[in-house]
Amino acid sequence: MNPNPQSTSSNFHQTELDKFAALANRWWDADGPQKPLHALNPVRLDYVAARVALPGARVLDVGCGGGLLSEAMARLGAQVTAIDLAPELVKVARLHSLESSVQVDYRVQSVEDLAAEQPGSFDAVTCMEMLEHVPDPLAIIRACASLLKPGGTLFLSTLNRTPAAFALAVVGAEYIARLLPKGTHHYKDFIKPSELAAWLRTAELQLQDVSGMLYEPWRNRARLSSRTEVNYLACAVKP
């Protein structure tokens, strides 16, 4: 796959784009390689909807993949723009949107480029399961902050850099239970909540909440939790 010609950003690993692009055709298969993501999606949606009135809100989904969260927010009435650097994923997202008749503005574009074009345009920005896959997470957060209107909210989810996260998200999920393709995650790129909080302060955002997100593979269900050792969600507001 060639780098996206529409983007001037270099804030991506081509191997990461290729890895997820290879999953494009089964992105919406609830029993496929993205099975855990399908289980996490209702939790992510509820977390956002509890903090932002989605009907009529302008929302940007950064690193949208095949559009699971994008479509879910649009179904609740949000005006969703969704971006990703993998053309294969955006194509799948657009096709599914046509099948479901849920309107989402999907684009192959970097968040940095969009921030240069449309600063201060969105009531909320979501960036889920993406920061641990890019070379410069702070640059992503800065761009997201720029895109928010004053009073807008940034929603993030990622993986904590702990022994528990390594054991469960890497060894357990990829090599033992085989819930995810091998190589999906790299432990060194996981992000501690304290690191995320520091980046949010640097981007002049005010951290509002950090909540754990627990995935139960034996039930294929996920829920919010007070434990942040593995997956966690965070939200921050632009003053």
Swiss-Prot record:
<protein>
    <recommendedName>
        <fullName>Ubiquinone biosynthesis O-methyltransferase</fullName>
        <ecNumber>2.1.1.222</ecNumber>
        <ecNumber>2.1.1.64</ecNumber>
    </recommendedName>
</protein>
<dbReference type="GO" id="GO:0008168">
    <property type="term" value="F:methyltransferase activity"/>
</dbReference>
<keyword id="KW-0489">Methyltransferase</keyword>
<dbReference type="GO" id="GO:0032259">
    <property type="term" value="P:methylation"/>
</dbReference>
<feature type="binding site">
    <location>
        <position position="128"/>
    </location>
    <ligand>
        <name>S-adenosyl-L-methionine</name>
    </ligand>
</feature>
<keyword id="KW-0831">Ubiquinone biosynthesis</keyword>
<keyword id="KW-0808">Transferase</keyword>
<dbReference type="Pfam" id="PF13489">
    <property type="entry name" value="Methyltransf_23"/>
</dbReference>
<feature type="binding site">
    <location>
        <position position="44"/>
    </location>
    <ligand>
        <name>S-adenosyl-L-methionine</name>
    </ligand>
</feature>
<comment type="pathway">
    <text>Cofactor biosynthesis; ubiquinone biosynthesis.</text>
</comment>
<dbReference type="GO" id="GO:0102208">
    <property type="term" value="F:2-polyprenyl-6-hydroxyphenol methylase activity"/>
</dbReference>
<feature type="binding site">
    <location>
        <position position="84"/>
    </location>
    <ligand>
        <name>S-adenosyl-L-methionine</name>
    </ligand>
</feature>
<comment type="function">
    <text>O-methyltransferase that catalyzes the 2 O-methylation steps in the ubiquinone biosynthetic pathway.</text>
</comment>
<feature type="binding site">
    <location>
        <position position="63"/>
    </location>
    <ligand>
        <name>S-adenosyl-L-methionine</name>
    </ligand>
</feature>
<dbReference type="InterPro" id="IPR029063">
    <property type="entry name" value="SAM-dependent_MTases_sf"/>
</dbReference>
<dbReference type="GO" id="GO:0010420">
    <property type="term" value="F:polyprenyldihydroxybenzoate methyltransferase activity"/>
</dbReference>
<dbReference type="InterPro" id="IPR010233">
    <property type="entry name" value="UbiG_MeTrfase"/>
</dbReference>
<dbReference type="GO" id="GO:0061542">
    <property type="term" value="F:3-demethylubiquinol 3-O-methyltransferase activity"/>
</dbReference>
<comment type="similarity">
    <text>Belongs to the methyltransferase superfamily. UbiG/COQ3 family.</text>
</comment>
<keyword id="KW-0949">S-adenosyl-L-methionine</keyword>
